[in-house]
Amino acid sequence: KKCMKTLLWLDDYRNPMEDDWLNFSPIGKDVEVVWVKSFNEFVDYLNKPIPLPDAICFDHDLGEEKTGMDAAKYLVNLCNNLRLKLPKFNSQSSNPVGRENIMSYLENYKKISSTKSYY
């Protein structure tokens, strides 16, 4: 039995198991979903002594000061410092500017980091 891939779902509101939200998953719908609802929960999950998730879906507006963009920056710093490959990613945010910022930030890091030998 193959291991299920893990999708980390960052969203304060949308339940990833409802409606068609898993259409946003960059690794398909046959996934184990971990739903975190805040920046702090996101950070706590990434700091566990387990491998990074296979993919992460970002919401932008989390109903608090910290946004999905802060989470994206945290992820990039973590991957950069620990020389880890960036998980696949997408954003289900209904904030078009926030969504674009997160996606282009992560795409840019992916481009830069792919030139490094450990990627």
Specify the residue positions occupied by each region the protein language model found.
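Catalytic phosphate/metal-binding cores of nucleic-acid and nucleotide-processing enzymes, i.e., regions
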Residues: 3-119
